[in-house]
Amino acid sequence: MAASSSSSPLPLALPLLLLLLVLFASHPSPHAAAAAADAAPAGGGGGGSGGELLSAARAPGFAAWLRGLRRSIHRHPELAFEEVRTSELVRAELDAIGVPYEWPVARTGVVATIAGGDGAGAGTVFALRADMDALPLQELVDWEHKSEESGKMHACGHDAHTTMLLGAAKLLQSQKDDLKGTVKLVFQPAEEGYAGARYVLQEGVLDDVSAIFGLHVDPRIQVGTVTSRPGPFLAASGRFLATITGKGGHAAGPHNAVDPILTASSAIVSLQQIVARETDPLEAAVISVTFMKGGDAYNVIPESVSFGGTFRSLTSEGLSYLKKRIKEIVEAHATVHRCTATVDFMEEERIPYPATVNDEGMYRHARAVAVDVLGEDGVKVGTPFMGSEDFAFYAQRFPAAFFMIGVGNETTMRKVYPLHSPHFVVDEDVLPVGAALHAAVAMEYLNKHAFTATF
């Protein structure tokens, strides 16, 4: 018996084989880990699940805190690069929560950092972003927290964005020990036309970021619902100002003048032919002339007329084509009508925004997390929207996902007003939803990518 057992190598090899199998199972290949991460359901890692985060954000004390923040910001709207008071509020709340931050970033911005575990900040870095600036509008909503700043209003929901990100900061800080990486929270200035995102990127505070997520309120969809889509989601956009100069004269003798108003009218009509006859019907493009300024007397043909507006496309190539043709058409009409023309695209003052393109993988990740937070019925596939967003600059740099989050309520709102309306209102039930979704998207991303960042 002793001789037969010592002559066979199988009993000795069996423990070694089992040990190798255990080691391989605990350290899969990077490709296998990545595939598992893409397939994993949301809420599978450490920390709170999406549903738990939403319950925490909806707790009476937490929700009341969010409402108070949003109302304070709403009463004191500030325009692009003027967000001094808003920035002070953000920093005060971060101090109270115990979250460190960098300031100033891009003049008035704040970038907070929540490092998981021991706070060393090793591993994957994920970013969340909210914009802070308001619009030059006089608020016409009659409620106790309306704007106290004449001619300024949060008519695009950036007060809600800032509040939701502060809520996410509080949730993430409470789950700090379970974070498998670092979350950066970007409180960004100057989204409304001044490309604040570009200035944030130029300062290098996001150079270590692996991916980014953002939300924007949408009154067209019901509160508690989000929409998005992979690929192009929001349009690229540019602005133009055309000036046509002729020869002024008496209205009774137009033959002695060179009429710039007629020239401008002809050019404006022809601009729409770019969309109607030069653009593929399956590709979205918009040219909108939004103002025209000429003389101020009934009986005088003015010497010059100016007009301008925006142009938009879902591709960079489409935007470049629109820009080229606007210039050609305005100048050609001026020549035909014996006028001169200049077209200014104001790119130094107002940088054109690229299209916001959702990364396929990041979209799938954010959608899965949103389903975990809101349920399948709360997550819809959206259609492309011809509005533009400087979040696009982040999306050019990192894998990004941008979602619209509903603030409409058919039950409580007599009428739904669009973004940028002086009558725009927000259903504040969105605040805990956005806070929880921000936090869940970040936490689950770090859970999924912890292996590739630390192995």
Swiss-Prot record:
Keywords: Hydrolase, Signal. It is an enzyme of class 3 (hydrolase). Its EC number is 3.5.1.-. The keyword Signal applies. GO terms for biological process: auxin metabolic process. Residues 1-25 form the signal peptide. This is IAA-amino acid hydrolase ILR1-like 7. Belongs to the peptidase M20 family. Hydrolyzes certain amino acid conjugates of the plant growth regulator indole-3-acetic acid (IAA). CDD domains: M20_IAA_Hyd (cd08017). It comes from the Eukaryota. GO terms for molecular function: IAA-Ala conjugate hydrolase activity. It holds the Pfam family Peptidase_M20.
